[in-house]
């Protein structure tokens, strides 16, 4: 059952990433049709913009991300238990030892970053280290190490980049169509019915694509959280430890320092004040759902 869940989550992520690329091509084609009467040119432009965004974000410095989140690098002498747990989990996962950081914050949280296992890092709050027992801390670190091993940071970064690219292209397309004085619209009024249909479809694509992109990006983030939970259990062989850790995380207070959207998606638990929004608009699945899945393993 455990490995079936892992495989299912991986398949869902592939499907969502494919949907993202389709969405990017559609928004590019719509903009190209409205502005240059060329689907191909618009789609190619959209893919280039998406690739530039993805590469620039993937290679963002690990130290920069840690600095933005007030994390300080430690050695084995600073927090030996925490350091050795990270070391043990990395060994079991068969990845290089990540750099280890601590965030001085009373909330219960942790995250991993790095575009590959070779330049990865793990951070945990002082609150987490104080409250979690060894089994629970192993489960949390197993979750973060699984993100590294599964290249989740890279996948999530690509999703954020593609969502940003879709929003940018939609904004550019909308502004240029407005400033062009409606030449495309005038042409389509004199065209056949198909041209009018394509005009409406293109305009709707520009309007709705950013929302759709955000929903897909958030869905990918949630799937990777489910996958990391299951992968942590595969590493520790202790689903109860993961369940107890999640139960404690559910009672955590928000982080005391501001956390930006990109960083928030990295944490094991939503680091900001939890708003009563639909699960569709959350970077993290409800902890109750995560626990329920673990109980059925």
UniProtKB/Swiss-Prot annotation:
- Enumerate the Gene3D superfamilies for this protein: Metalloproteases ('zincins'), catalytic domain
UniProt-listed Pfam families = Peptidase_M48 (PF01435)
Primary residence: membrane
**Residues that, per the record, bind Zn(2+):** 143, 147, 225
**What residues form the membrane-spanning segments?**
14-34, 39-59, 158-178, 193-213
What membrane topology is given?
A: Multi-pass membrane protein
Q: Which GO terms describe its cellular component?
A: plasma membrane
Known EC number: 3.4.24.-
Q: What is this protein called?
A: Protease HtpX homolog
